[in-house]
Amino acid sequence: MSNNIQQHIDFSISTYCQAKCRSCQRTNQDTGEPEDWLIPSHMSYDLFNSMMDKTPDTLRVIQFCGELGDPMMHPDITKFVDRALSKESIKHLVINTNGGLRNPEWYTNMGLKYGSKILLQFGIDGITHDTNWKYREGVDFAKAWDNMIASSKTDIDLEWHFLIFKWNWQEVTEAANLAKK
């Protein structure tokens, strides 16, 4: 058996999200509210810490994914980041976010503290508030944009995930040009 079996673990640390993306499985397409089956919760730090204590030394990447919520909604996100990156074997922490939470100072501080050990994946689907809102309803575009720009001024690894829809495809070229800056 290979020693490389457990190199990446994805933690869903929160089911809270301020966005009302109509095609997200957590959102009722008609109302924009969370589905009735969704139980809003944050993973406890004690549980995460216990799991981290049990992870193998072959673990290289931890991801905080936004499958049912945005990790940045977690009130203890900073503690989670610090704990994840305290494990010597961890080379990268990947965080998916719509970007509309926290503030530029938080992202700058994480960049200064951890640099390229963090990969932030910002889900911003337009270059204007109106375009982004068509899918990511509930997300403050200006805040998301400012947070992404603040991150880009540090050594954080950054990816802009721009989902293409019929209402934003015409912005792809301009978005690509902005991403190069």
Predicted regions mapped to residue ranges:
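Conserved alpha-helical substructure of the radical SAM core
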Residues: M1-L119, D130-A142, D146
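Conserved strand-turn element in the central/C-terminal portion of the radical SAM core barrel
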Residues: L93, M148-E171
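Phosphate/oxyanion-binding loops and surfaces in catalytic or ligand/nucleic-acid-binding neighborhoods
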Residues: T27, T154, L178
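A short alpha-helix capping/helix-coil boundary motif
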Residues: T58-V61, D125-T128, K153-I156
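Secondary-structure boundary elements
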Residues: K87, K153-T154, K181
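Short, electropositive alpha-helical surface patch
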Residues: D76-A84, Q121-I124, W169-K181
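Short beta->alpha connector loops
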Residues: T97-R102, G126, I164-N168
